[in-house]
Amino acid sequence: MQLNGIGKHSIRFLSDKASRFVPKGGVYPKGFMVGGIHCGVKKDGKSLDLAILTNTHGKSAVASAVFTTNKFKAAPVQVSSKIVKEKKGEEINSLVVNSGNANAVTGSQGMKDAQDMITVTDSALGNPTNSSLVMSTGVIGNNLPISKILSGIPQLAGGNLGNTHEDWLNCAQAICTTDTFPKLVSKSFELNGHTYTLAGLAKGAGMICPNMATLLGFFVTDAPVSASALDQILKFATDRSFNSISVDGDMSTNDTIVAIANGAAGGELIDNTASSAESFGILQREITGFAQQLAQLVVRDGEGATKFITISVKNALSYGDAKIIASSIANSSLFKTAMYGNDANWGRILCAIGYSQVSSGDSINPAKTNVSFIPSDGSSKLKLLVNGEPEVVDEKRASEILSVEDIEVEIDLGTGGGQECKFWTCDLTHEYITINGDYRS
């Protein structure tokens, strides 16, 4: 990542992020191996740029994936989505990822390169054809240095995979581009008398806007779950996590979120039938919370960001309307720059609410709308607007609330609908311009 023009204070802040958010250890699912190496995609000659994750359990795994909605879908997105669709999520065991080049808008050669990455990975791991999915991230419009990648895959698969914390960190680092720290989360949970484990990695710092953008994420579990149930759970979880974040309002060509389950920890199969309803609900809750934790790390690492902002919309007529309103605020450059400047300009919040494209005119009633800042120290909320009437705001307290890293804005629509949504974003700073102005240099 280029740091030209970024001051010493900002560099210290970025380093502090890494120390706070990169785990010193973790718990990892049974039956998976991961790793990352430098194969030559990145120009500096040393940064990790090739990652593999694979199922080593005796039985084949199941997978689900959610892909970008951008019309210019990158070659790896097209190839991987076809495999998931044709195999209905069954017998997908591995992921291969390169960073530094997106393999997007690269024509027929890009499609061939993406398929070749899968073919060589399957061969190196001893898996049947099309048992892997492929991801790429980086600069758009350049062909991959494919010979370097195809030479690197057997090297990585042949002796550089493992299940230690270091292996998982290497894998997380190998998918980064402008990220200032690798994003890795893991946890264990109890279900039906068994202990199951989740581990996840994500990449993203810029071009983050629903529905996903320059965002790669994958998480795996050793819980036993059917392909159809995993697909339903992933879509629910993604809608409330990776599709509920925004950094800069740009949507990428390469977004991919993948979940893989191998059942290595044993137990009864969890599916989406009535007999599994309770177990399905618990697993969905665990995966959704886990996905939110991983997605929030992407926002915390937003390019140039100094603030982590939670937007809570309450008492909406529907979850969909609550999310539309929250997204409208999160993508407002005026709102984001106000947060950077510790400016309690709630008029910008109302403006974004007012132009949001909600499904019904009844969803927003100016005379019932309430806006507040929720302090991170647990003290009483600072009311800015109550039932459409402005409050006399203590500007000093408002500035103090906005001066810390974690900020929450609460919007109570007062419709009585009871639906709510949380959405996460960051501020917009001078450093964002510097980073993106230097991206290809």
Curated annotation (Swiss-Prot):
Catalytic class of the enzyme: transferase
InterPro entries: Arg_biosynth_ArgJ, ArgJ-like_dom_sf, ArgJ_beta_C
Keyword entries, A-Z: Acyltransferase, Amino-acid biosynthesis, Arginine biosynthesis, Autocatalytic cleavage, Mitochondrion, Multifunctional enzyme, Transferase
Binding residues annotated for substrate, in chain numbering: 177, 203, 214, 303, 436, 441
Site (Cleavage): 213-214
Family stated for the protein in its record: Belongs to the ArgJ family.
The protein, known as: Arginine biosynthesis bifunctional protein ArgJ, mitochondrial
UniProt source species: Debaryomyces hansenii (strain ATCC 36239 / CBS 767 / BCRC 21394 / JCM 1990 / NBRC 0083 / IGC 2968)
